[in-house]
Regions:
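Short, well-ordered beta-strand segments
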Residues: 11-15, 63, 87, 111, ...
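Alpha-helical linker/hinge and terminal dimerization helices associated
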Residues: 1-5
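Flexible hinge/capping segments at coil-to-helix
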Residues: 6, 74-84, 88-110, 193-194, ...
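Hydrophobic hinge/microswitch elements
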Residues: 47-52, 56-60, 65, 116-175
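Secondary-structure junction motif
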Residues: 110-132, 198-206, 215-216, 220
Length: 228
């Protein structure tokens, strides 16, 4: 009712999980507002399990998360991928490496996202960590990227994050280094119910691909390196 009173003719409810970087949506949402100002766009930050339930229950029209393991009745389409980097505090001994071997990373404590709040991110990181025969030492599990990088900056632990997340944080005390070898990628997926989309949703999905294709590519070498 309030949306109609404000002059909106349609609504698009978008769920975000796994700490999806808000800057990824700036160009997309700006384009939506320019093309269809009559569409009321609502964003909801929720855990992945809640997003999936909400999509099934028609609480959300579409969502973004870092997992394609969403069960029956939900479609997961890759939207974009981000190179994984190691977030390292300034003046840390690992900064002698331009590309850090994963087994060297695991010699130090890690700060991770809460697996309940960042389920998809946690699954992708767990798969990467299983590629070496070393048990990670998890110093802390946190609810936000900001707190994760604050702990890194303070020297408590290292973290594994997407390069665009690290670039967006603008913290001079946190330096990004790619992993040695072929850099793993963190993939973000667009999730929606496996039904014919509404015209409004269909136009939104059509906008995602060109926005993502035209987005700057964050290669590991472009990741912020300060005082190194």
């Amino acid at each position: 009712m309030r949306a109609a009173a404000a002059g909106y003719q349609a609504q698009l409810r978008i769920a975000l999980s796994d700490g999806i970087t808000p800057s990824r949506f700036t160009a997309l949402l700006a384009q939506c507002r320019q093309d269809e100002p009559e569409v009321d766009i609502r964003l909801y930050e929720v855990p992945l399990s809640q997003q999936i339930r909400g999509l099934h229950d028609d609480l959300y029209d579409v969502g973004f998360a870092q997992s394609a393991e969403v069960g029956e009745g939900i479609l997961a389409e890759a939207a974009w991928s981000d190179p994984l980097v190691v977030a390292v505090p300034a003046r840390h001994p690992l900064l002698t490496y331009k590309r850090i071997p994963l087994d060297e990373v695991l010699r130090y404590p890690l700060v991770m996202c809460d697996p309940q709040l960042c389920e998809g991110y946690g699954r992708q990181i767990a798969r990467i960590l299983r590629t070496v025969d070393v048990e990670p030492l998890v110093a802390e599990e946190v609810a936000s990227l900001d707190l994760m990088l604050a702990l890194v900056a303070a020297g408590y632990a290292l973290a594994l994050v997407g390069s665009s997340q690290l670039i967006a944080c603008r913290n001079a005390d946190v330096i990004g280094r790619p992993l040695a070898g072929r850099s793993p990628m963190l993939t973000t997926y667009l999730l929606r119910r496996d039904v014919e989309p509404s015209e409004t949703l269909s136009r939104f999905i059509d906008r995602v691909s060109p926005i993502i294709t035209d987005a700057p590519s964050h290669t590991p070498e472009s990741t912020k390196e300060i005082n190194s």
